[in-house]
Amino acid sequence: MKADIHPNYKEIQVNCSCGNTFTTKSTMSKDAFHVEVCSACHPFYTGKQKIVDTAGRVEKFNQKFGAMRGKSAA
């Protein structure tokens, strides 16, 4: 292998918003990384269904583009 061409591969601490922490290896320059969802709290792995609030986004879309519904694309 050539010298000084490969990135520094080190252990980093991954912190989830649920409080779970684990260690992995990465080429990131930081020593810690924050994620919103991990295998300890993701619905696919836990088997629990999580309701995502999309009503606010739909209402915002309708307010922005709702007046265009009656008009034709001509």
Swiss-Prot record:
Keywords: Metal-binding, Ribonucleoprotein, Ribosomal protein, RNA-binding, rRNA-binding, Zinc
Cofactor(s) for this UniProt protein: Zn(2+)
GO biological process: translation
Annotated Gene3D superfamilies: Ribosomal protein L31
Gene Ontology terms for molecular function: metal ion binding; rRNA binding; structural constituent of ribosome
Entry note: cofactor: Binds 1 zinc ion per subunit.
A Gene Ontology term for the protein's cellular component: ribonucleoprotein complex
Positions bound to Zn(2+): C16, C18, C38, C41
Superkingdom of origin organism: Bacteria
SUPFAM superfamilies: L28p-like
Family: Belongs to the bacterial ribosomal protein bL31 family. Type A subfamily.
PANTHER family, per the entry: 50S RIBOSOMAL PROTEIN L31, CHLOROPLASTIC, LARGE RIBOSOMAL SUBUNIT PROTEIN BL31A
Purpose: Binds the 23S rRNA.
HAMAP family from the UniProt entry: Ribosomal_bL31_1 (MF_00501)
Name assigned to this protein: Large ribosomal subunit protein bL31
Organism this protein belongs to: Dechloromonas aromatica (strain RCB)
